[in-house]
Swiss-Prot record:
This is Transcriptional repressor NrdR. The gene is nrdR. InterPro entries: ATP-cone_dom, NrdR-like_N, RNR_NrdR-like. Belongs to the NrdR family. Keywords: ATP-binding, DNA-binding, Metal-binding, Nucleotide-binding, Repressor, Transcription, Transcription regulation, Zinc, Zinc-finger. Its cofactor is Zn(2+).
């Protein structure tokens, strides 16, 4: 890394430590030319896969769209914001763990349903009714029966 003071190419790392729950590395560096010290932070560049919609259109993963869908299902339910954010982080981790550059929306939807099932059964049924396009009350009953198994 170039020195921010004299633009020299050679710097050495004096100290490294994990910060932000281990998601960042803080490094103290010293320039070998001017001896000035400075701090850098290193984070992994985590790229989420693109999403393939049902009409084969590809678009970047949209975390805000995911959050809106989950919050709509969880409206007026006793689930904390922290629990929702944890679920969103878990879904993103699962998507990254696929190692794929593109994933179908069906996979994202199924991950959301799994997360909602753990968070709140009513929210799960709300989301499933829209996601799976329930046509009548019988389909609601069948899904509720599956939840009780």
């Amino acid at each position: 890394m170039h020195c921010p003071f004299c633009a020299a190419v050679d710097t050495k790392v004096i100290d490294s430590r994990l910060v932000s729950d281990g998601s960042q590395v803080r490094r103290r560096r010293q320039c070998l030319d001017c001896n000035e010290r400075f701090t850098t932070f290193e984070v992994a560049e985590l790229v989420l896969p693109r999403v393939i919609k049902s009409d084969d259109v590809r678009e970047p993963f949209n975390e805000e769209k995911l959050r809106r869908g989950m919050l709509k299902a969880l409206e007026k339910r006793p689930v904390s914001s922290d629990d929702v954010e944890t679920a969103i982080s878990h879904i993103k981790s699962q998507l990254r763990a696929t190692g794929e550059r593109e994933v179908p929306t069906k996979m994202v939807g199924n991950l959301v349903m799994e997360a909602l099932k753990r968070l709140d059964k009513v929210a799960y049924i709300r989301f499933a009714s829209v996601y799976r396009s329930f046509e009548d009350i019988r389909e609601f009953g069948e899904e509720i029966a599956r939840l009780q198994d």
